Amino acid sequence: MSNSWNTRVEIASDVETLRDLTRDAFGRQFEVDFLDAHRAEPKAWLPGSMFVATGPDDRPVAYALLTRCHVGDVPILSLGPVAALPAYQRQGAGGAAVRAALAAARERTEPAVVVLGHDTYYPRFGFRQATEFGIHHPQYDGPHLMALALGDAAVPAGTLTYPVVLTES
């Protein structure tokens, strides 16, 4: 597989493909429901914020999603889900989508991005534990909650809130 991926913003015809990709990548429905809930919530969903890495046929094989969240009253971005089809995992497709998403976040002049994810994966993109920035989540302040400062703006400190919250049953 290639180490050089084409990336782009999702297009309307990608939506069902990305739902299927999510189910295949995570092996369950919860993350698909999470994705659908974000699409349905205008306080979370940012048009043009789903970045895909594509295969040779321009079909998405991985993606990274940016949505709106807040630290206190300050809007920042949340990264996730990030997913790749099993056949494309560990081949750089997901990382390419993450890099495209973070580049777009910098262009938007956002102050920061948070992610709840693998603490051995996201530091390669510059993420550090969110508590180092004074960002706290009411239910979780562990090593998997990370933040990335974008640009020169101060990273807001305070309580992290999301407009969409789903709990696993």
What label would you give each PLM region?
Residues 1-37, 44-61, 152-169:
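Short amphipathic alpha-helix that is part of the acyltransferase structural core
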Residues 50-52, 59-69, 75-83:
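Conserved beta-strand in the GNAT
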Residues 107-111, 116-141:
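Conserved active-site alpha-helix within GNAT-family acetyltransferase domains
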Residues 104:
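Short alpha-helical functional segments enriched in proximate histidine and acidic residues
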Residues 48, 141-145:
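Short hydrophobic/aromatic beta-strand or adjacent loop that forms the aromatic wall/cage
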